């Protein structure tokens, strides 16, 4: 902090205040700054050893402060004194019209009486974090306007009871306005009990509860909270779930992560979830089934439309009885519209709802099939289909079904895919085929290039045996904006210059069978703004400034890439003999990003373009070029040092 701040008596904005050592900024210097406004953060309060100095700051009279953060060090050692810190915090009572208050790493065993005082009628958000010595909380239920309460890393706190939420008057509600309540990293917390009093005294507006990393919490006995709609539980025991799920019948969202002891959602839990719309289950390693009975789940979860199960390594099936369920039985969660199943390696099958719209399955390597209870084809409602890392999945059977409704199709790392569907993908806007090593061709008729008027994104990537690709129809993709064709070493096409999609804005291409030096002349569309060329150990990238430049070259059959001046990003990767791109790139006056990878002989850059760049990356293979860019005495340093995103050494 600069010296003399305290003399600026008209100062209104001072968002960060750092208390210094003996010769540094002292908290008493804030005494005369009566006009401070808005958000104020005071850090280093552990360096205040005289509570009188804290009281002299007179925060209570600084009426312009609306958001206040008070922070001590997160190191709790012998240099700290809990009694002094209590007195300091007591002396820093703010103005009663405060909107937001954060108290961080305070060492006192208790809080001063002003924390939770009902006179703070405008306080809407309160955060108590890292106050590890605190053994009990003040009565916060008095705060009439409080909407959000965050309690984090209060390791000394073992019990929360009705005193925590007690209202001002016996006939009032505790926390009458609270909407969001979060407990996080409460390592010593064991009991949360509000029972024993009037059943209607607390949380009339509470919508969301989050309990995260509270491993010792075992006893939860709280009153009904009819307004509660969202429940997040993470790194807790299953008893917390069983207790909290019964406090409301209005749950819309339930998120469970790393719940110890959770083997399935038993009937005693399911029966409270009739209104549930979103169910998220993550990293529950003891989970083998989501529920005992598929038919029971169907009867209860009638509103569920978003189901996500991720990283549950022992999950065998969503329903225990589904293991032997006939796919024609018609039993499934018909209301579900969106399903994400990620990295559940033992999951063998999934019975999809007939009305599903979005199906995304990743890394479920044991799945061999997807079934639809009453349909022979994929449902007409399906808009998004993404399947990735399926070792034994019969992809050909699935993808040969009717696909006309799809708007997004992504197939990645599916080794059994050997052919592309022959259905007409008339509504497709995004298509990704990545890492499918057994597919050899994408037939013109089967791919349906001619009707793909809606396609905006096409990626064919890392398909090592792909040979046939209907490149001659690229020019018909009039809506295509982004095209990736990369690392397909058996594609033997040269992409004649007149066949590029006319409205292409992004092109990533390279790593094909024939090096770019043998492609012949290329005239990229004038709409192009991002170009990434992957030479895959090719010699040079044959840039040309214009078509006239191409005609003037001695060998008119040689490769020449005419890059449009509209380009804003250029990436050059894997051109082993490329030495210079000086003249060929001077016309790229709109260029903002230049990325160079694996071009070991490149020694020069288009110097006149460098001042306009916002991003320049040169990797370690281009040793000579890096020397010219790195260091104050380097050739390009005066210019490149001004580039915001620079990586040249």
Where are the language model's segments positioned?
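Innate immune receptor modules and recognition interfaces
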Residues: 1-649
């Amino acid at each position: 902090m600069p010296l003399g701040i305290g003399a600026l008596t008209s100062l209104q904005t001072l968002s960060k205040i750092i208390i210094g050592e003996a010769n540094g900024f002292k908290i008493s210097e804030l005494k005369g700054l009566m006009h401070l406004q808005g958000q104020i953060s005071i850090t280093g309060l552990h360096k205040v050893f005289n509570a009188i100095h804290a009281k002299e700051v007179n925060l209570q009279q600084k009426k312009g402060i609306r958001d206040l953060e008070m922070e001590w060090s997160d190191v709790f050692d012998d240099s700290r004194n809990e009694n002094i810190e209590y007195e300091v915090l007591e002396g820093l009572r703010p103005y009663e019209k405060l909107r937001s208050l954060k108290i961080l790493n305070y060492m006192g065993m208790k809080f001063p009486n002003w924390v939770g005082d009902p006179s703070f009628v405008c306080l809407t958000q309160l955060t108590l974090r890292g106050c590890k010595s605190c053994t009990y909380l003040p009565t916060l239920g008095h705060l009439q306007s409080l909407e959000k309460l965050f309690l984090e890393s209060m390791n000394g706190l073992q019990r929360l009871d009705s005193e925590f939420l007690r209202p001002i008057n016996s006939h009032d509600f505790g926390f009458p306005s609270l909407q969001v309540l979060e407990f996080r990293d409460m390592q010593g917390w064991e009991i949360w009990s509000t029972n024993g009093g009037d059943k209607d005294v607390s949380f009339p507006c509470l919508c969301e509860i989050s309990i995260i990393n509270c491993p010792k919490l075992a006893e939860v006995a709280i009153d009904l909270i009819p307004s509660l709609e969202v429940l997040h539980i993470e790194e807790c025991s299953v008893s917390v779930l069983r207790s909290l799920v019964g406090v409301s019948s209005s749950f819309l969202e339930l998120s469970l992560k790393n719940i110890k002891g959770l083997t399935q959602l038993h009937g005693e839990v399911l029966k409270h979830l009739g209104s549930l719309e979103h169910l998220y289950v993550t990293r529950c390693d003891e989970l083998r089934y989501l529920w005992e009975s598929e038919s029971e789940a169907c009867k209860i979860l009638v509103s569920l439309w978003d189901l996500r199960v991720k990283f549950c390594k022992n999950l065998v099936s969503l329903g225990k009885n589904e293991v032997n369920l006939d796919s024609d039985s018609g039993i499934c969660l018909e209301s579900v519209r969106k399903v994400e199943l990620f990295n559940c390696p033992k999951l063998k099958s999934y019975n999809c709802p007939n009305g599903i719209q979005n199906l995304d399955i990743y890394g479920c390597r044991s799945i061999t099939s997807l079934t639809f209870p009453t349909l022979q084809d994929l449902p007409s409602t399906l808009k998004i289909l993404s399947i990735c890392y399926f070792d034994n999945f019969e992809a050909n059977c699935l993808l040969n079904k009717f696909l006309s409704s799809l708007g997004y199709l992504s197939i990645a790392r599916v080794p059994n895919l050997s052919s592309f569907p022959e259905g007409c993908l008339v509504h497709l806007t995004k298509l990704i085929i990545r890492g499918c090593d057994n597919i050899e061709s994408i037939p013109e008729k089967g791919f349906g290039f001619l009707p793909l008027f809606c396609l905006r994104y096409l990626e064919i990537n890392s398909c090592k045996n792909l040979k046939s690709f209907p490149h001659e129809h690229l020019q018909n993709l009039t809506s295509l904006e982004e095209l990736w064709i990369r690392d397909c070493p058996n594609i033997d096409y040269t992409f004649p210059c007149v066949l590029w999609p006319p409205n292409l804005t992004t092109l990533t291409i390279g790593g094909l069978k024939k090096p770019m030096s043998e492609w012949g002349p290329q005239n990229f569309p004038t709409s192009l703004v991002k170009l990434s060329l992957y030479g895959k150990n090719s010699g040079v990238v044959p840039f040309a400034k214009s078509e006239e430049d191409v005609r003037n070259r001695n060998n008119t059959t040689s490769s020449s890439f005419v890059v449009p001046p509209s380009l804003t990003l250029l990436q050059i990767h894997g051109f082993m003999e490329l030495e210079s791109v000086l003249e060929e790139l001077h016309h790229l006056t709109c260029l903002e990003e230049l990325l160079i990878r694996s071009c070991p002989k490149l020694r020069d850059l288009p110097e006149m373009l460098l001042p306009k760049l916002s991003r320049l990356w040169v990797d370690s293979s281009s040793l000579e070029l890096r020397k010219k860019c790195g260091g104050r005495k380097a050739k390009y340093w005066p210019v490149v040092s001004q580039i915001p995103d620079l990586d040249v050494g």
